[in-house]
């Protein structure tokens, strides 16, 4: 993996982690159940993206 590719993956990891955290934070503050569910689902997707990127780094 080139240094540029590694930097891209590291940046993407940070963004996915931040997005997961924000979605979970907003979900905990929202009273509307449908919005809470949507944000929780988004947080799960960002966690999956994070895990996928981590798997690429560990190969």
Segments the model singles out, each with a brief description of its role:
Residues 1-59:
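His/Met- and acidic-residue-enriched segments that coordinate or traffic transition-metal cofactors
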């Amino acid at each position: 993996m080139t240094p540029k590719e590694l930097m891209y993956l590291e940046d993407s990891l940070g963004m996915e982690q931040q997005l997961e955290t924000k979605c979970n934070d907003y979900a905990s503050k929202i009273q509307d159940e449908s919005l809470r569910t949507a944000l929780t689902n988004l947080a799960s997707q960002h966690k999956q993206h994070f895990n996928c990127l981590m798997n690429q780094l560990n190969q």
